[in-house]
């Protein structure tokens, strides 16, 4: 898996820089929530404001060719995302990862330094995910409506307080 990560990291993570970049200690930021809640949209906005590499769960699944959404498959995906995120952080990058991370067990496998819960919909696009999803007890920031530009600014402010 280590070789796979080294070969694939460069095509799965990308940089977007802006004039609003803040200085902070290296962080792995997890943006989690139900499918269709706005995780990817928020991640795309936030990565414009923070010098970071971005990991999208769907892209990682595509490269791994692993479309198993069972509980075991989701744990495997969380571990895979964890491996990518840690490698990128160890290379000196902030990391923004967006994925469902539906269960406490999956969340324990992912080493987030800062967790954003995107809680904008009552149910997602997939019944099996809705049934499996457990609302997180622990998070650093709670997004309650779909306005990625506004929420990314609020998250940036919160992150700058916790530098």
Predicted regions and their residues:
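Conserved lysine of the Walker
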Residues: 39
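Conserved substrate/cofactor phosphate-moiety recognition/catalytic segment
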Residues: 43-83
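Hydrophobic anchor at the beta1->P-loop junction of P-loop NTPases
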Residues: 31
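Glycine-rich phosphate-binding loop used to anchor ATP phosphates in small-molecule kinases
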Residues: 72-123
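The conserved Walker
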Residues: 35
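Small-molecule kinase domains that catalyze NTP-dependent phosphoryl transfer to phosphate-bearing small molecules
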Residues: 109, 118-163
């Amino acid at each position: 898996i280590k070789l796979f990560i080294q070969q694939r990291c460069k095509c799965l993570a990308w940089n977007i820089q802006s004039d609003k970049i803040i200085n902070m200690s290296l962080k792995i930021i997890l943006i989690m929530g139900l499918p269709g809640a706005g995780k990817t949209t928020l991640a795309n906005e936030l990565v414009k404001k923070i010098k970071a590499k971005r990991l999208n769960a769907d892209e990682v699944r595509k490269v791994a060719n692993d479309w198993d959404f069972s509980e075991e498959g989701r744990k495997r995906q969380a571990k895979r995302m964890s491996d990518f995120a840690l490698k990128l952080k160890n290379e000196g990058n902030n990391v923004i990862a967006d994925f469902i991370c539906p269960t406490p067990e999956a969340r324990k496998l992912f080493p987030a330094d800062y967790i954003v819960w995107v809680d904008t919909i009552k149910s997602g696009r997939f019944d099996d995910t809705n049934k499996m999803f457990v609302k997180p007890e622990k998070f650093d920031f709670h997004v309650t409506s779909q306005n990625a530009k506004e929420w990314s600014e609020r998250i940036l402010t919160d992150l700058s307080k916790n530098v």
